[in-house]
Amino acid sequence: MAVPESKAALLEEMEKSALSLRKKLSRIPAEIAYQECLEGHVTGSRMSVANLVSYLIGWGEQVLYWHHQEAAGEEVNFPAKGFKWNELGKLAQKYYADYQHITSWPMLLVMLEENQQQLVALVNGFSDDELYHQPWYGKWTRGRMIQFNSVSPYRNASARLNVLLKALTAA
């Protein structure tokens, strides 16, 4: 799994990571989805699979918001307004809270799917040059920032779900 270096490679990795994640999430029973059965994003904390999905939606929305801010000529808040890069655990907890009112597991999965489709549409709106041949945030290209906050967390989530699914199968 090499780091994407082109628009086509990014779109391919986005699709592959989303498909893998979707397959694993489809195996999570609704009655388990809201139980704190995973290691959280903050050391020593626990989270539910629903929290994990909320985290993914939150990051996806954040990426979309960065681009909304940029298009509006506003200063882009990286990683998010009121948060620093060394406070990502707190930001994860904010994302859990942002979606805690969604108590329907199927609805949360639909929201994740819609968010992923919006990210694909975002990428499709840029040329390869705009994504990978000019810095966007410091030394990072736009494509790399999108990959950091979509493909990478999807892969991490899939790995977490593998552990849970093995435990559920063994039980």
Residue ranges of model-derived segments:
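Extreme N-terminal tail/first-helix region
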Residues: M1-K24
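Acidic/histidine-rich alpha-helical segments that form the ligand environment
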Residues: K84-E130
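A short small-residue
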Residues: M1-A2, E39, L91-Q100, W136
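Solvent-exposed, charged/polar functional surfaces in cytosolic regulatory/catalytic domains
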Residues: S20, K24, Q118, L122, ...
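Active-site flanking loop/helix segments enriched in acidic
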Residues: I32-L38
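Hydrophobic packing residues in well-ordered alpha-helices of helical domains and bundles
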Residues: K7, L11-M14, V49, W105-L112, ...
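Short, contiguous alpha-helical
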Residues: L38-K90, G125, E130-A171
